[in-house]
């Protein structure tokens, strides 16, 4: 992702500035990475109940809701964004796997 840092940071800043259309650029840049991350965190048993795309969708939606509420005031660039999306996605995948194992 190092070659598109300006466009990602620009999209993030535009979105924080009120341009709701710029979230699409962020989605396109990160969704497949989030799916891969979730895939690595879910075992086969968990994936039969909720696949990695569900986790990635949930993580991105959670990020959007929380960012709109102003919960991430230090979110300034693509590195901040990736770290945050990584944490949200990892936690959701781990929680989903735990929940599915209990069921």
PLM region spans:
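Conserved RNAP core-binding helix
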Residues: 5-12, 27-31, 47-70, 79
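Amphipathic coiled-coil alpha-helices
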Residues: 11-14, 22
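Intrinsically disordered or compositionally simple regulatory linkers and C-terminal tails
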Residues: 1-3
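Arg/Lys-rich amphipathic alpha helix in sigma70-family domain 2
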Residues: 40, 68-69, 87-103
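Hydrophobic alpha-helical bundle segments that form small-molecule/ligand-binding pockets
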Residues: 42-46
